[in-house]
């Protein structure tokens, strides 16, 4: 069983998001430890980027604040290394949320080599088309890193295509558009998850727009877990 899938074996998974470097990398490390002690089953760590096209204003502003501190990708890898070592080592899966540009600029092989060395279990790359997953995925898999697929409201044919190739877990996008808190989630998540489960037994976690405990509970009822980002970052 993959490290990521293992996070879903204890029940419904709670997956918080944090933007690395926002308010300083030392605080990011501290917040992640607090999240894990509070019961997070996996933590999604956002690598700040100047053009985060999938993000709403809250996470965009967090990225801008992080970049203004001068945080670099190497600093984030060093932080993850600290989290993974010592008597108080964090053992839950840690996944990066990033974009193609930072990976390519840093160097794909170098990026995934360091992911393997420090203990990153997976990456989420929202601006990578499914059709282009192959090359990046092969490099990631060589280093034991899973590339998480996103599924938004779309045709069953496309859901089938993505679900059959998924690894780790599937990130089910609750609302079209960018991330951010929504007062109401109108998408029929239950039917999307049921469609996904026709083609794979990979866990499905719902994200984008979850802003209240009630919403998180509702999404977890029809899936395997809930991802909460903007509400935590705010």
Q: Where are the language model's segments positioned?
A:
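N-terminal amphipathic alpha-helix/helix-capping segment at the start of soluble metabolic enzymes
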Residues: 1-15, 79-85
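Hydrophobic faces of well-ordered beta-strands that scaffold small-molecule active sites
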Residues: 14-18, 43-45, 94-98, 123-125, ...
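Glycine-rich beta-to-alpha transition loops that act as phosphate-gripper elements at the mouths
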Residues: 19-24, 97-105, 129-130, 150-154, ...
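Catalytic cores of alpha/beta
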Residues: 25-36, 154-164, 206, 210-226
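Glycine-rich phosphate-binding active-site loops on the catalytic face of alpha/beta enzymes
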Residues: 40-52, 120-124, 128-132, 174-180, ...
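Active-site beta->alpha loop and helix N-cap motifs at the rims of alpha/beta catalytic domains
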Residues: 47-49, 60-125
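Glycine/Thr-rich beta-alpha phosphate-binding loop at enzyme active sites
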Residues: 59, 159-198
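Catalytic beta/alpha-barrel core
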Residues: 68-70, 119-132, 146-154, 160, ...
């Amino acid at each position: 069983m993959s490290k990521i899938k293992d996070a879903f074996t204890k029940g419904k998974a709670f997956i918080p998001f944090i933007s690395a470097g926002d308010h300083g990398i030392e605080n990011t490390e501290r917040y992640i430890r607090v999240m894990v002690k509070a019961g997070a089953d996996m933590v999604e760590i956002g690598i700040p980027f100047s053009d985060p096209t999938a993000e709403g204003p809250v996470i965009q502003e967090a990225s801008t604040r992080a970049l203004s501190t001068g945080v670099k990708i190497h600093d984030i890898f060093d932080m993850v290394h600290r989290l993974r070592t010592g008597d108080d080592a964090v053992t839950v899966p840690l996944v990066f949320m990033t974009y193609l540009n930072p990976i390519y600029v840093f160097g794909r092989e170098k990026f995934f080599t360091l992911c393997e060395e420090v203990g990153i279990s997976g990456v989420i790359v929202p601006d990578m088309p499914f059709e282009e997953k192959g090359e990046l995925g092969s490099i990631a898999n060589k280093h034991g890193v899973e590339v998480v697929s996103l599924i938004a409201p779309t045709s069953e044919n496309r859901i089938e295509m993505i679900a059959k190739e998924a690894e780790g877990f599937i990130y089910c996008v609750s609302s079209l558009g960018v991330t951010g808190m929504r007062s109401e989630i109108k998408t029929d998540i239950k039917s999307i998850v049921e469609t996904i489960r026709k083609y794979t037994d990979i866990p499905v976690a719902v994200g984008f727009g979850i802003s209240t405990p009630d919403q998180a509970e509702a999404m977890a009822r029809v899936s395997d877990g809930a991802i909460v980002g903007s509400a935590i970052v705010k």
